[in-house]
Amino acid sequence: MSSIIDVYAREVLDSRGNPTVEVEVYTEAGAMGSAIVPSGASTGVHEAVELRDNDEKRFLGKGVETAVDNVNLEIADELVGWDVFDQVGIDNYLIELDGTENKSRLGANAILGVSLAVAKAAADENGQRLFEYIGGVNGKTLPVPMMNILNGGQHADNNVDIQEFMIMPVGGENFKESLRIGTEVFHNLKNVLKSRKLNTAVGDEGGFAPNLESNEEALQTIVEAIKKAGYEPGKDVMIAIDAAASEFYEDGKYNMAGDNAVRTSDEMIEYYKNLVEKYPIISIEDGLAEDDWDGWKKLTQELGSKIQLVGDDLFVTNVKRLQKGIEMGVCNSILIKLNQIGTLTETLDAIELAKRHGYTAVISHRSGETEDTTIADVAVATNAGQIKTGSTSRTDRICKYNQLLRIEDMLESTAVYDGIKTFYNLSK
């Protein structure tokens, strides 16, 4: 046993210039763990609560001094003397201390910062990397990157309704090679956009947000970039999309302004079936709204054996909502965002539940990120097989990829990279 002797939080900034919480945990043996909490742009209504000060005189109301004070003035005193290796006990106690269903009293940003810093301090105490501490000898699978290279929806100001268009370089023999493939496609995409005199500035997650005319033009442009990079779409590189459909769901219909169309759930399903037939799409995230359970069930029946259907806003990394999805036969994959649920233990529980029922898990960043690389370690530790952490642009995204390169080097010959086999639950 090694006791926690101090817990300290401060207000720092994320990649969008918004305040967030950083927490440090110290042990009696001299170990230290530090974690910075990310923040989302499009958030599901069922997510754990990110506590903001709502004081318009500071950071336009986005300050997090209340969450910081909750760590320094309440949580810290409770954890002093606690065994740093008792991750489950600490996380469960933090949930109990908060006392709400959605962590709205102390704030999920306060609780998660502490939870992750505890894990990092424990790893430091053991002389281990975080992925080794969480995953043990079995944590050795490098994830296929899901790289956001074109943006629409809430992430852009253009005529594209679908929020994210991503590439998945499945053709590499290892993570390092796949990262290179994805990077080369990204640079070729920039050249394609430049040749059309389109904007090549990057957004929050490092993707381009040019003024394209439609969702299909975005897909066509990506296919062109893949080919120009010297790779074969559908073999070396697959496409994934995040529709973020809750953002354009109104009064039971899907209002896709870019397509000048208002669609029902059934019409959205036909729309996706058509896209999957025409383009090398392997994964659709948030294809329907977060509470359109019946629509999701139909979508899964129609496409669930052919492509990955990822629940993000639908599941919000929540075991209860995932269990409902499993029982209804909804989706075949879950997006894992640590700050949606608020503790490391609950995150690992969600991944484990997904795996037990044949669902894949995609470890994900948020729009507001930092230099913190926790998700890279979690992806390897849990053998998730996939990571969504932006394009190969912006240091807040690159740092996760660089951490994965380091981990792959450390694992040497024991490292595993599954490529297309990461979609083990598909029939095609």
From Swiss-Prot:
Keywords: Cytoplasm, Glycolysis, Lyase, Magnesium, Metal-binding, Secreted. It comes from the Bacteria. Its EC number is 4.2.1.11. Mg(2+) binds at residues 242, 285, 312. It comes from Finegoldia magna (strain ATCC 29328 / DSM 20472 / WAL 2508) (Peptostreptococcus magnus). The active site is at 205 (proton donor), 337 (proton acceptor). It is an enzyme of class 4 (lyase). GO terms for cellular component: cell surface; extracellular region; phosphopyruvate hydratase complex. This is Enolase. The keyword tRNA processing does not apply. Pathway: Carbohydrate degradation; glycolysis; pyruvate from D-glyceraldehyde 3-phosphate: step 4/5. GO terms for molecular function: magnesium ion binding; phosphopyruvate hydratase activity. Its cofactor is Mg(2+). (2R)-2-phosphoglycerate binds at residues 163, 337, 366-367, 388. It is found in: Cytoplasm; Secreted; Cell surface. GO terms for biological process: glycolytic process. Belongs to the enolase family. Gene3D superfamilies: Enolase-like C-terminal domain, Enolase-like, N-terminal domain. It holds the Pfam family Enolase_N.
